[in-house]
């Protein structure tokens, strides 16, 4: 069963996919969106869902450090609800506190990637970390 992990922002969605057995996550790509104009990237998500035969989504919840919910949590939950309605697949949520920080640290310390290049891959890596945390929690 393949699971798709999503790191939802207001302008981009980082996408990751699990292996068929659900043990590991791999970052795929970053989809450009525009929340204000109602463009959620679902055409591209559908292509990926069909290609990888996705059966479930995991959306990151960017909670505050004190475990409270802010406007981005609400936006992520709204995106998840739209996914569920559009695709008819179950949506789970995963706490994503510090995943972007961890992703950036990995890119700086382990890969020594420049700031400009980091911006191009950070959301994809964050989605991978969100999905991997979810998979680790399940097994």
Curated annotation (Swiss-Prot):
What are the UniProt keywords, alphabetically? Cytoplasm, Hydrolase, Nuclease, Ribosome biogenesis
InterPro entries recorded: RNaseH-like_sf, YqgF, YqgF/RNaseH-like_dom, YqgF/RNaseH-like_dom_sf
Q: What is its EC number?
A: 3.1.-.-
Q: Where in the cell is it found?
A: Cytoplasm
* Alphabetical list of SUPFAM superfamilies matching this protein: Ribonuclease H-like (SSF53098)
Q: Name the principal localization, coarsely classed.
A: cytoplasm
Which Gene Ontology BP terms does the record give? rRNA 5'-end processing
Top EC class for this record: hydrolase
Describe what happens without this gene: Probably essential, it cannot be disrupted.
One GO cellular component term noted in the UniProt record for this chain: cytoplasm
MF term (GO), any = nuclease activity
Q: A Pfam family for this UniProt protein?
A: RuvX
> What's this protein's function?
Could be a nuclease involved in processing of the 5'-end of pre-16S rRNA.
Name the family the entry cites. Answer: Belongs to the YqgF nuclease family.
Identification of the protein by name: Putative pre-16S rRNA nuclease
């Amino acid at each position: 069963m393949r699971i798709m992990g999503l790191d939802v922002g207001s302008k981009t969605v980082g996408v990751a996919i699990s292996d068929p057995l659900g043990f590991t996550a791999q970052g795929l790509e970053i989809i450009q969106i525009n929340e204000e104009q109602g463009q959620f990237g679902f055409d591209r998500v559908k292509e990926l869902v069909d290609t990888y035969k996705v059966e479930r989504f995991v959306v990151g919840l960017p909670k505050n450090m004190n475990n409270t919910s802010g406007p981005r949590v609400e936006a992520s939950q709204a995106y998840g609800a739209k996914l569920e309605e559009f695709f008819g697949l179950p949506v789970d949520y995963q706490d994503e506190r510090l995943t972007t920080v961890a992703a950036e640290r990995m890119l700086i310390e382990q890969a020594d990637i420049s700031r400009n290049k980091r911006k191009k891959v950070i959301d994809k890596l964050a989605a991978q970390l969100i999905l991997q945390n979810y998979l680790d929690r399940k097994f």
